[in-house]
Amino acid sequence: VGIGDLFSLRIAGNIAGQKVLGSLEFACQAKGSKVILVLGHTDCGAVTSACQLRLQQKQISDVKEMPHIQYVLGPLMHSVESVYDIMQPRELNKTFVNQVTAMNVHYNIQYIINNSTVLKDLLDRGEIAIVGAIYDVKTGHVEFLDA
């Protein structure tokens, strides 16, 4: 992997799962990628939908028109609940959704570290870095998050 080369993974809701872990392990262990960037973005439809469900006191199973949406929204609910517990007012607005987006980036970094011994070992040895950021879809600005 050279300068400017990317091994890109995209998934609705920016959710790390088993397939994402496998792809990240391949990118780092087999292909030599040195940085994992967990990049959330503003105006994320999946994050907004998860927030909306919680604020309306609905369950994912209430979304009948998309029977597989549980695999996208389910992992987001941890971040939604974390923000819901600490934030006032609890309403569907830009501030609430942005806080959930940032929390979700942090949560997924921890998920990667806690669920992949390969990536954790590479991280502990200083062979890779895992960083989080939020991409603003309106301005193109990327804000890197504190660890």
Where do the language-model regions lie?
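Short helix-loop-beta junction
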Residues: 1-8
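Divalent-metal-activated hydrolytic enzyme cores
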Residues: 4, 13-34, 45-147
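Conserved functional hotspot residues or short segments at active or partner-binding sites
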Residues: 38
